[in-house]
Amino acid sequence: MASNSTKSFLADAGYGEQELDANSALMELDKGLRSGKLGEQCEAVVRFPRLFQKYPFPILINSAFLKLADVFRVGNNFLRLCVLKVTQQSEKHLEKILNVDEFVKRIFSVIHSNDPVARAITLRMLGSLASIIPERKNAHHSIRQSLDSHDNVEVEAAVFAAANFSAQSKDFAVGICNKISEMIQGLATPVDLKLKLIPILQHMHHDAILASSARQLLQQLVTSYPSTKMVIVSLHTFTLLAASSLVDTPKQIQLLLQYLKNDPRKAVKRLAIQDLKLLANKTPHTWSRENIQALCECALQTPYDSLKLGMLSVLSTLSGTIAIKHYFSIVPGNVSSSPRSSDLVKLAQECCYHNNRGIAAHGVRVLTNITVSCQEKDLLALEQDAVFGLESLLVLCSQDDSPGAQATLKIALNCMVKLAKGRPHLSQSVVETLLTQLHSAQDAARILMCHCLAAIAMQLPVLGDGMLGDLMELYKVIGRSATDKQQELLVSLATVIFVASQKALSVESKAVIKQQLESVSNGWTVYRIARQASRMGNHDMAKELYQSLLTQVASEHFYFWLNSLKEFSHAEQCLTGLQEENYSSALSCIAESLKFYHKGIASLTAASTPLNPLSFQCEFVKLRIDLLQAFSQLICTCNSLKTSPPPAIATTIAMTLGNDLQRCGRISNQMKQSMEEFRSLASRYGDLYQASFDADSATLRNVELQQQSCLLISHAIEALILDPESASFQEYGSTGTAHADSEYERRMMSVYNHVLEEVESLNRKYTPVSYMHTACLCNAIIALLKVPLSFQRYFFQKLQSTSIKLALSPSPRNPAEPIAVQNNQQLALKVEGVVQHGSKPGLFRKIQSVCLNVSSTLQSKSGQDYKIPIDNMTNEMEQRVEPHNDYFSTQFLLNFAILGTHNITVESSVKDANGIVWKTGPRTTIFVKSLEDPYSQQIRLQQQQAQQPLQQQQQRNAYTRF
């Protein structure tokens, strides 16, 4: 089973070297383990993690770990150390060990060795296995015993194991807490050992009583042992315990603030700041106004920049959370807590122009967050302070190429975007500052500033036109060197120009960009700019850039990919000539566009490979082609009202048949077909959306907009022609209320609202079908097509990669060979799966659970046709399982009462953290042959044999009568 399932996984993985199946790979490593040379044994051991990565199913992992346990049992300490490292690296695979008892038994045998180093390695090994053996009493006993050892190495290993078991087992934590307390407080325990024992207390959070006793002990330690190291370790453990147990977080914040204020030691203050930052990130809602005020006072009083920087970083974290609302809320006893007069604002204003960049950045961030979150009208002075602070920081950091300056600049630019979004009336001055500084800044800073300008222009398109002049001037004078920064700057500037040019690029802008790109030998830069042009709907520019790249690629797959992009851009460019009320021209434009789309889809199919099938791209383009054809067909149908109007007796026919639509003539049937076609397209767009689990939100929104376009037209057909009386506009009326994140979405929303208004107006005024109704439909199509299609990121680039590999057992040796099952028994089908990720797992969404659907269908019958209940003829089951460490397994009991060959299909889909179901696949099929059980077969044969003499006797009697 494992070898079959993992072979397909390797075929998909695309490794360059020659691959073996799971059993062969394990046998190769087993040879190394049995070698007499220590070097070969070690090499075999350290290659196991890669084996687990390639074949992540339990049957192989179980065998491999048992072999490693044998090596651990009989090998020397160096081999044991190698096995320990492999176990720690393969932590996520430990729960796939099936024979845990046997595995632990082989490991545990070494604990009785006379060698303290061997015992120490065994203890560390047991600690690494704590997640799968949390309640093993013999392991608990060995750890307690080893804590009393006279060998330092063994004691340190016991401390490591105790920490791991305390995190996993409540019983162990309760039992070890008193012993650790005695050891820490004992005079005979060395100080360095006490420092290693104290962090174990952070895991004593399994219940309130245990957490309380651990807190009391830590409180005693902080008071009784005032040395710097002890205070630092105790306070940090205190913080981690509070963060885990949650109930004592406010007390811990007060304690840390007390040490920050009163303890003169810098190291303790730094630790307090670090822990306050941790609590600010994890539990900002537990911070009271008094806590923030105390931190502000400390920051105002401290003369040390390093400490002030730390405190401001805590405050800047809090200023972006609910804590800032608490701070400025109306307090009993005060009329109001004005932002302008608070210590927090004074501190931020004081730090905005500090000579330390980090302090200035955090000061500006605090001011920005206060300005955006406090929706009061009299904040003009605060807004000006925030803007001036950002401007000074921008000037300071844009002239410096150092990594620190770039990190500070990112903070400032993020604040600018936030300020422009939260306070739109400040956006103009922010943009002017950026454009002014863009000319004199370093290239690295220019790139970041371009990203900032693009983000602001996406949010506030009205500012785009004002940017273009400065941007084009800069593009003309930009350097032409082939350095990475210059290439990146060309792409960033071009992106801002595309965003700022809301509808179409001017001829001058195109000429400037092309002129600069001609001198750039880097084809990758040209491709990236073309990609951005496709994303922003500048298809004429994109077509020319793709055309220029066709001769610069070596691979035929890349050639076909670029050629397909060129054809798609050309196809979309054909639609820019559409004009309202000119329907014959619209038909010719759509026909021309379809011609190039068909060429493009042929190239795109040629560009796909087994490792990169381009499934999303192909489906997206096929849907676009079908949508254009549906639009064309609908325009022809509307035109047919002129060429083939309803006959004079149409009204009489309609009254006779009782179908009011018949008075419209044959156009009614054609419209009904069109409506069904658009609904079918909307359903297919929905399927594409559900299959795109790894797509970014902008791409998904784009697919959603295409789906809404189909639904809009189908609704318009129904409301205008097919069923005007029952048409409802309420469910469609809210489309414009959602916030649009891109110019494409904004324009599409505008078209939707306009079309809905027109349809509703006609629906109320006129009865169908008139030329005004068909003209409204045609104008709606033209309005939708006049918005240039946006090819979003996922069409070009896959930032997140998630796939599921399934293994079924039992499974046949040959995939085409069926599994034999008796018809009076049930088949226990075990389904195992592994979730595989790319380099950025969970970037856009994470898998919460996997939904497994198992169904069976009868392929061919054999034997007699018995009357069997319908319930026994098919199997249809579904289960949801939550992956743990990217692994899941479950079982299904299937019934095959009908003799014959059955086809079992297992299909997986996933559910993300928001509860949305995604049809990711895969779909796996096996065959089962249902055979008659021997006992039933024997009885049937006996009955047949008993019937044969009776039949012969009847036959003889018949002959006698004759």
UniProtKB/Swiss-Prot annotation:
Subcellular location(s): the record lists: Nucleus; Chromosome; Cytoplasm
UniProt-listed InterPro entries:
ARM-type_fold (IPR016024), INTS7 (IPR033060), INTS7_C (IPR054519), INTS7_HB (IPR056517), INTS7_N (IPR056516)
Pfam assignment, any one: INTS7_C
- The answer to keyword Phosphoprotein applying to this record is yes
Which terms are listed as keywords in the entry? Chromosome, Cytoplasm, DNA damage, Nucleus, Phosphoprotein
Give any single GO term for biological process.
DNA damage checkpoint signaling
Q: Which residues carry this modification: Phosphoserine?
A: S338, S809
Give start-end ranges for the coiled-coil region(s). Answer: none
Q: Predominant location of this chain?
A: nucleus
One GO cellular component term noted in the UniProt record for this chain: chromosome
Q: Which family does it belong to?
A: Belongs to the Integrator subunit 7 family.
Q: Subunit structure of this entry?
A: Component of the Integrator complex, composed of core subunits INTS1, INTS2, INTS3, INTS4, INTS5, INTS6, INTS7, INTS8, INTS9/RC74, INTS10, INTS11/CPSF3L, INTS12, INTS13, INTS14 and INTS15. The core complex associates with protein phosphatase 2A subunits PPP2CA and PPP2R1A, to form the Integrator-PP2A (INTAC) complex. Interacts with NABP2.
Its annotated function is as follows: Component of the integrator complex, a multiprotein complex that terminates RNA polymerase II (Pol II) transcription in the promoter-proximal region of genes.
**Official protein name in the record:** Integrator complex subunit 7
**Species, as recorded:** Homo sapiens
